[in-house]
Design a protein with these regions (language model features):
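ABC ATP-binding cassette signature C-motif
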Residues: 1-261, 321, 325-536
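Short low-complexity stretches enriched in small and charged residues
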Residues: 21-28, 290-293, 315
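Proline-centered turn/helix-capping motifs that create local helix->coil transitions or kinks
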Residues: 137, 303-315
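Short amphipathic coiled-coil heptad-repeat segments
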Residues: 142-149, 276-279, 297-307
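ABC ATPase nucleotide-binding domains
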Residues: 259-280, 284-299, 318, 531-536
Length: 536
């Protein structure tokens, strides 16, 4: 099949900080290995090194077999990318190159169709497309679009990605990779944005696949059901748990206890050696015969210190979110006979101050459009909706594409958005474990760090109604728990689109976007609604 082997990898950030050092592990043929760790620990950077996007400062990466990669932020909502572009993005390089040559030849034909050299180049591009497996890829893509979107590739290929939900884009890429020819897959947060049926599908596909898979995830259910081994990156180092996620936390606690004991013993021995050197130094001042013992003790102490202490026990994150909110009118959101054009049938609902309402349903059913409409975005609709008195919406978008933040550091953004001086900005960032990222451009942060920063902006904005679209998808476990605690103390209204079964337990009631195009309310979460059947 294929394998991945990483040996003593090291990566240093532009500011000189070491992101990780001495990272070593092996993903054997057919293994399903999860890569876990806090947001910003370097998981995505490590995957990019294995994929060949980055060159390590030191260490080696060895792989065998074809390598398929799904990056953390796949697809797009802000440009004219199409379904074909997304599928080409996860295709083997030879297919990508042949497609680029064919596109160029077709464009030349449109401009100079009577030119014989142009016609010859077009004929050669068609032949190369077939020789590199392009037609086989199109057969595969047809299967993928039918499975993910319910339509054949011929109808779907030029459809804009902005018309697909984040979950539909993810499912499409996963279908192509899991069905494709590559023997080794690198999947960065593959479960993000998938609805619950999609997550269950992914869990089963990973278990059944013969491919070698290294995947990053914070989803406790996926880790429990699909991973056979766990590689952890924390505090710049790696360690491997050879069992499943069911025994991971116990193994991590035992490891930390061992590290603490080793450090205690090292400190005791260090103190003894320093005391010995001091005693012998005093004796050697009035007894020349003790000089050799004194120098021997000095050498022993120096070698002990050069060998260094054992590995530090990893520090647990302490993310502290202070979501305030504020009193609003009793009816925070009123929806009257609202129809999201081309998505769902008309529905009416009232959401009252202080409620926590979950918005559930399959990928592509219109949930994100609904939140975007409430946030003031341009969404085609009929019917009426309004926000109550003193309702200030704060929108957490599902995708992290923020062109207005690109090239600007977190400190700059906090000054521009909320007039925070550097000292106050760094204090706010420290509560979100982002203090070391203050001078980094927003786009260089990990997905989880970007999510935390967006939540900080909501906190500082004083929003009285939070419109959260998949808020926990990129968050590590500590950050997700901090968000749940923050929402519990929030004095305002929360409307959350989520497929997180843990987060849903803290919500009061649910608005379900059904497979038949209807929208209905339930007191308990409903996870088994299928894809909405509509003309595409």
């Amino acid at each position: 099949v294929g394998h991945v082997e990483v040996t003593k990898l090291r990566h240093q950030l532009p500011d000189g900080r070491v992101l990780f050092a001495d990272v070593s592990f092996r993903v054997a043929d057919g293994a399903k290995v999860a890569l876990v760790g806090p947001n910003g620990a370097g998981k995505t950077t490590l995957v990019r090194m294995i994929a060949g996007d980055l060159v390590p400062k030191s260490g080696t990466v060895t792989t065998s077999g074809g390598l398929g990669v799904m990056r953390q932020f796949i697809g797009s909502v802000r440009d004219d990318s199409t379904v074909r572009d997304l599928l080409l993005g996860v295709a083997p390089p030879r297919v990508q190159q042949a497609a680029a040559a064919l596109d160029a030849a077709e464009l030349a034909m449109m401009e100079h169709d009577d030119d014989e050299p142009t016609q010859m180049r077009y004929a050669q591009a068609l032949a190369d497309w077939g020789d590199t497996g392009g037609y086989d890829a199109e057969v595969l893509w047809d299967t993928c679009t039918v499975a993910a979107l319910g339509v054949p590739y011929e109808r779907a290929q030029y459809r804009g990605l902005r018309t697909l939900s984040g979950g539909e884009q993810k499912r499409l890429a996963l279908e192509a990779l899991l069905r494709g020819p590559d023997e080794v897959l690198l999947l960065d947060e593959p479960d993000n944005y998938l609805d619950v049926p999609g997550k269950l599908w992914l869990e089963n596909e990973l278990r059944e696949s013969v491919k070698t898979v290294l995947f990053i995830s914070h989803d406790r259910e996926l880790l429990s059901r699909a991973a056979t081994r766990i590689v952890t990156i924390e505090d710049g180092r790696s360690w491997v748990h050879g069992g499943s996620f069911a025994t991971y936390h116990e193994a991590r606690n035992e490891r930390n206890e061992r590290l603490e004991e080793l450090r205690r013993r090292w400190d005791e021995e260090h103190a003894k050696l320093k005391a010995l050197v001091l005693r012998l130094k005093i004796k050697a001042t009035y007894n020349d015969g003790m000089a050799s013992q004194y120098h021997a003790a000095q050498t022993r102490l120096r070698r002990f210190e050069e060998a260094g202490p054992p590995e530090e026990t990893p520090r647990d994150q302490k993310v502290r979110m202070r979501l305030q909110g504020g009193r609003t009118g009793v009816r925070a959101v009123t929806v009257d006979n609202l129809e999201l054009t081309g998505l769902m049938r008309p529905f009416s609902v009232e959401i009252f101050f202080g409620e926590r309402v979950g918005v559930l349903g399959s990928n592509g059913s219109g949930k994100s459009h609904f939140l975007r409409l409430l946030a003031g975005g341009e969404v085609a609709h009929t019917g009426r909706w309004k926000l109550g008195a003193r309702v200030v919406p704060g929108h957490f978008a599902q995708t992290h594409e923020h062109p207005e933040m690109v090239g600007r550091s977190l400190v700059e953004l906090l000054w521009a958005e909320h007039s925070l001086q550097r000292h106050d900005a760094m204090r706010a960032l420290a509560r979100y474990e982002l203090q070391f990222c203050g001078d980094q451009p927003f786009e260089t942060l990990s997905g989880g760090q970007q999510a935390r920063f967006q939540i900080l902006l909501l906190e500082l904005a004083g929003s009285t109604a939070l419109l959260l679209d998949e808020p926990t998808d990129n968050l590590d476990l500590a950050s997700a728990e901090a968000l749940e605690e923050g929402l519990a103390g929030y004095q305002g209204t929360v409307v959350a689109v989520t497929h997180d079964r843990w987060l849903a337990r803290s919500l009061d009631r649910f608005l379900i976007f059904g497979a038949d195009g209807s929208v209905y309310e339930t007191p308990e979460p409903v996870w088994d609604e299928g894809r909405v059947v509509r003309e595409r």
